[in-house]
Amino acid sequence: MCVFCEKKLFMHAIGLSGYSIREIVSSLDQPVSNSLVRNKGFVGKILELILGVNVLHGYKCIDFPSLGIELKSIPINSSGYPLEPTFICNIPLKNNSLNITWNNSYFYRKIKKILWIPIIGNRVVSFLDKIVGEAFIWTMSSVQEKILKKDWEEFMDLIIIGKVEYISSKHGQVLQVKKKCKNKHVCIKFINYNGCVKFTNPRAFYFRKSFTWSLLNLSK
């Protein structure tokens, strides 16, 4: 798509600033189920609907493939600080991870250009009553990319040699690897460092709160 289309998307996102999620939901032409409202990913789904993300574009695609843009929301408190790490993408734990490089990785595609939308409201505020903040588009600086790449490569090195379960919250400067599953009984196969097939909880990459905080400050 042309630059105008990116500008159109950005202006649409900017136009949401100041509205509550409840107001945005009421503007949609389709009903929203009660189960979705109670879901942690509810706000993100509503933003996808209102901004025109094609939910059928495939699991491995970014949200706006023709623009090369991923959509991410950041829950922040009334002081503007992120409430939680930001989920980026799931991590492949199978042997096909061996052929992944930084530039051809799903993770890289996900973070190459991001449309960030802050969602304002402390933890006690219901999803519907949270307020949309001012959107901004972010692309990595050379310094940011160097740090992100270093973290990513260190994590992938551990995963490739079968040491995913050795990864802790202490690893990574701006990235985190965390368990990503509804409950501890959800498991997937991986090959451990002894070459044995084992089961573990799915993992995902997250931006640390301190990193998204720095992005929010740079956007001002």
UniProtKB/Swiss-Prot annotation:
SMART domains assigned to the protein according to its UniProt record, in alphabetical order: MutH
Pfam families for this protein: MutH
A single GO BP: mismatch repair
Main location: cytoplasm
Keyword tags: Cytoplasm, DNA damage, DNA repair, Endonuclease, Hydrolase, Nuclease
Top-level taxon: Bacteria
Keyword Nucleotide-binding carried by entry: no
Record GO cellular component, one term: cytoplasm
InterPro entries the UniProt entry points to: DNA_mismatch_repair_MutH, DNA_rep_MutH/RE_typeII_Sau3AI, DNA_rep_MutH/T2_RE_sf, Restrct_endonuc-II-like
GO molecular function: DNA binding; endonuclease activity
Localization: Cytoplasm
Role of this protein: Sequence-specific endonuclease that cleaves unmethylated GATC sequences. It is involved in DNA mismatch repair.
Family from the record: Belongs to the MutH family.
Protein name (Swiss-Prot/TrEMBL): DNA mismatch repair protein MutH
Name of the coding gene: mutH
